[in-house]
Amino acid sequence: MNIFALFETRVREALESLTRSGRLPEGLDLSRVVVEPPRDASHGDLATNAALVLAKEAKQNPKALGEALAEELRTDPRIVEASVAGPGFINLRLAPEVFQDVIRAALSEGENFGRGQMPGGPVNIEYVSANPTGPMHVGHGRGAVFGDALANLLAAAGRPVTREYYINDAGAQVDVLARSAYLRYREALGETITIPEGLYPGDYLKPVGMRLAETHGRTLLDQPEHEWLPQVRRFAIDAMMAMIREDLAAIGIRHDVFFSEATLQGENGGKVAELLDALRQKGLVYEGRLPPPKGQLPDDWEDREQTLFRSSQFGDDVDRALLKSDGSFTYFASDIAYHRDKWLRGANELIDVLGADHGGYVKRMQAAVKAVSDGQARLDVKLCQLVRLLRAGEPVKMSKRAGEFVTLRDVIDEVGRDAIRFMMLYRKNDATLDFDLAKVVEQSKDNPVFYVQYGHARRFSVLRQAREALPGEDFSPAALLADADLSVLTDPGEIEMMRLIAQYPRVLESAAAAHEPHRIAFYLYETASSLHSFWNKGKDLPQLRIVNPTDRNSTRARLALVEALGGVLASGLAVLGVSAPNEMR
């Protein structure tokens, strides 16, 4: 039950009534009419902008139109007050029965409460895509958690979602990986090695070298580089991806598709060559020279005639090169081919989750997706800012020794999956995140993950208290739904909890539409806080205790309320990929 959608429909019906009575002209554009929470909760339960956005088209004063609409809305018994504020906003105060119906809906729908049928076709979300050259670091973890939570969020809102990882296994960096692993292979066979500048010095490649020695013995030593390099490269990539998958599994990250970059460039150029042919057929490829970029020239800029894509026709700043001077494809050409492949597989919305250093990538790829799909697909690029590791407010040294750094696995082992996931999502993705290893394990209100999980655990602790105080009573959701008298819930704290529960479907919907899972984390903290506050009031005022053995009616009503609120906490935590414990240990 989404009260915002429900009363948006009611507002539209009231506007139609005004049209039928001649007080509004026909054919008004209602697409911008919304119902949302008022900016100040003291003004009411809902607010609509209808009078403001329609006044100009209707050629009416917005306040006068607002008064006419408010008068029409007051005829609805579910609306106890409709008042015009400011330039023409209409604030609505709802009858208690509306919120009682929300609680009943939450109890009857269980984990499906708030989940929607968001319009739109299949979504492809690509996230993590860390180079298979070493362990994941904390920055990778932020993108992984954000992408996974966004996938959960869109799925909860009703969109079909494909979760994808792009394996960068075709660039020069995997040859560097292979040569580094080959040195560790020689080391495993007893040689003393020196790792030259430009190769990967980390100890994480020692086990790869040992497994190479176990698999191949000394045979690779007798082969020239052009023979052993492809074998070691494939072996090392597989080993790195196995390590990355283990790290992802440790924080509950999953993917449906692992797509290899190398598969794009098959025989005769493969899918990248197909892309160039498709762009040529559209008249979007030409031979020309690019003007020098402003400021310091990048190393890869060349003053020569090049094969260019007309990306500036689709919103990019300049046209882009598709072929290098040696005739090989540019990274950009491969990226376009990959995104075209995602679209051809059926996704009409593509989302890339990338590090903040990819800001320059956004316009060109959005232009490319628009071009290859003839405007049928759109690309949203979500950039994740840096993570600063702290311990009790002091920066943590990221490098432990030469070639070694603090890995995502180190952080998982220290603070656990739930703390990482919740805190990575408790700040907007494009803002730098301070992750304090000491604070995220505190058992206090200042630690959001503890505070929200404690709110969910409280759902079960009050249920245990009720069973002890009133043995033989049935406190299942179905029983509470059948006979709890919700009209006794009149305390401001109870009303606040009901209002927050009623907001959950809209929070889920708006967070999904904006691609912003942090909204769920903020909402969960506020909702858990409302339960903790009411619980604390009951310690001082016996009549407000959730479980009162001498008052069966209030006990059952409050348990119904807590059960509904706890269900919302569990649902929201599931979207974030965080556990909802029945008790805190």
UniProtKB/Swiss-Prot annotation:
EC number(s) given by UniProt: 6.1.1.19
Any one GO molecular function term: ATP binding
Gene3D superfamilies: Arginyl tRNA synthetase N-terminal domain, HUPs, Isoleucyl-tRNA Synthetase, Domain 1
UniProt keyword annotations, A-Z: Aminoacyl-tRNA synthetase, ATP-binding, Cytoplasm, Ligase, Nucleotide-binding, Protein biosynthesis
Catalyzed reactions per annotation: tRNA(Arg) + L-arginine + ATP = L-arginyl-tRNA(Arg) + AMP + diphosphate
Any Gene Ontology biological process: arginyl-tRNA aminoacylation
Localization per record: Cytoplasm
Motif placement: 'HIGH' region: 130-140
Nucleotide-binding as UniProt keyword: yes
NCBIfam families xrefs: argS (TIGR00456)
PANTHER family: ARGININE--TRNA LIGASE, CYTOPLASMIC, ARGINYL-TRNA SYNTHETASE
The protein's name in its UniProt record: Arginine--tRNA ligase
